[in-house]
Regions:
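N-terminal amphipathic alpha-helix/helix-capping segment at the start of soluble metabolic enzymes
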Residues: 1-19, 84-89
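Hydrophobic faces of well-ordered beta-strands that scaffold small-molecule active sites
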Residues: 18-22, 47-49, 95-99, 124-126, ...
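Active-site beta->alpha loop and helix N-cap motifs at the rims of alpha/beta catalytic domains
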Residues: 51-53, 62-127, 259
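Alpha/beta catalytic cores of nucleotide-metabolism and tRNA/nucleoside-modifying enzymes
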Residues: 80, 195-203, 212-218, 222-261
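Catalytic cores of alpha/beta
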Residues: 29-39, 155-165, 207, 211-227
């Protein structure tokens, strides 16, 4: 419900939702907590909590390096759940975990979603799980009140339609086919892409993969209900380390201000 409420609150005010991403444990759990609260305080509506993975195939070099750095620092899924539980004493902002299927399977599907429910995780995004295999975790996720959020790429009309009709939480609309990372320009026909989506679902849609700064976020927001910014934030954290929370706040505030112009 928190995800739905976050989008509805912005929509009621004629605004767009801002979703920001962070690699958990990069420079330690305390730095991650501070950065998450910086994003929340600067106006982020939903936080994507990235679970570091040794071979993140959907990610560009910035997130790959941050994942590696986090794992080398001793980050574990159990440690991330503990961190999330602590954060729940500070904020009700929706949290969405982004990870790969192996992370869930190794941990144990039932145990994983049980902890999601207990610690206050609102949704999961599993980027390399094909839409056709989504049922492998769907029943358990639903039983624990966790949204299984789908990604949709600018593919065939029929495929976009199928994914949109089945969406829950929000629909993660991939701006262009490839890996994450910042881009200078996009080549996708967004009018046609979002036209198919909006005809087939009333679930909010947010666009991500490649949004590098405030003006690009503003430009992309006209097509959908929210924008997702990840690599640009991860890059700031990589650059400033334990001193990053202030910079992350400033960058997120810049995104929020641009969306509200």
């Amino acid at each position: 419900m928190r995800i739905k409420e976050a989008f509805e609150k912005r929509k009621t005010n004629g605004q767009k939702a801002l979703i920001t991403y962070i690699v958990s444990g990069d420079f330690g759990y305390e730095t991650t907590k501070k950065n998450i609260m910086s994003m929340v305080n600067a106006g982020a509506d939903i936080i994507e909590i990235g679970i570091p993975f040794s071979d993140p195939i959907a990610e560009g070099i910035v997130i790959q390096e941050a994942s590696q750095h986090s794992l080398e620092g001793g980050t574990t899924l159990a440690g991330i759940f503990k961190m999330v539980k602590e954060l729940r004493n500070e904020t009700d902002t929706p949290f969405v975990m982004m990870m790969y299927p192996n992370t869930i399977y190794r941990f144990g599907t039932e145990r994983f979603f049980d902890l999601c429910n207990e610690c206050g995780i609102d949704g999961v995004i599993v980027p390399d799980m094909p839409f056709e295999e989504k049922d492998e975790i769907q029943e358990t996720a639903t039983a624990h009140g966790v949204d299984n959020i789908s990604l949709v790429t600018p593919a065939s009309h029929d495929r976009i339609e199928s994914i949109a009709k089945d969406a829950e939480g929000f629909l993660y609309c991939v701006s262009s086919i490839g890996v994450t990372g910042t881009r200078n320009e996009f080549t996708t026909d967004f009018d046609a892409f979002f036209d198919v989506i909006k005809k087939n679902t009333e679930i909010p849609c947010a666009v991500g993969f490649g949004i590098s700064g405030p003006q690009q976020a503003k430009k992309m927001s006209r097509y959908c209900d929210g924008v997702i910014v990840g690599s640009a934030i991860v890059k700031i954290i990589s650059e400033y380390g334990e001193d990053s929370p202030k910079k992350v706040y400033e960058f997120t505030k810049g995104l929020r201000d641009a969306l509200d112009e």
